[in-house]
């Protein structure tokens, strides 16, 4: 109890500490990574009725099929969203909610079309091999090209599709650092 009181006493004063928005996310107990325009529109209507302020389209929005190991390019699936992802984002906004999407910007799936087209220095490396966990490579943000890729993804989502909220997730455990251009894996974290 005392530690909680102390933490609350030193916390900065700001509106975001007082009023957290109500966010609907379509993943848990709902679409489980299988979003489509047809499935999303009725959920958006119900989320609005329930008083939600944000609506997040979770994983799968970028893949025609199994989405887990195809992450990384972050281009909307035309099969899932025949009218485009922007159509769904615009519908969310028309209901007075902030549209959002799920991302794991720090990874690229082993089946992502871009994964084999970029040089190895985009990834954490150990013992001369790309580090991966659960079918995903860990991106190395020391590389300016990786930063440019991430910036381009965010810019596109915001400017082309009207995304106003990003749920940033992290679902792998790649271990400590990279040995590429470093004396040790830990040194590779220092940039």
Where are these regions (language model features)?
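A short, mixed-charge helix-start or loop-turn motif at secondary-structure junctions
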Residues: 25-26, 70-71, 135-139
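Active-site neighborhood of glycoside hydrolase catalytic domains
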Residues: 80-84, 88-94, 116-191
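Aromatic- and glycine-enriched glycan-recognition loops and surfaces
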Residues: 29-117, 148-152
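Structural preference for beta-strand elements that scaffold enzyme active sites
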Residues: 19-23, 53-56, 96-100, 163-167
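Short, flexible, glycine/charge-rich loop motifs used to bind or transfer phosphoryl groups or to couple energy/partner
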Residues: 12-13, 45, 156
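Solvent-exposed loop and edge beta-strand segments that line ligand/cofactor-binding
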Residues: 13, 30-31, 77, 186-190
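Boundary/entry segment of secreted carbohydrate-active catalytic domains
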Residues: 17-31
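Beta-strand-rich recognition/accessory modules
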Residues: 1-15
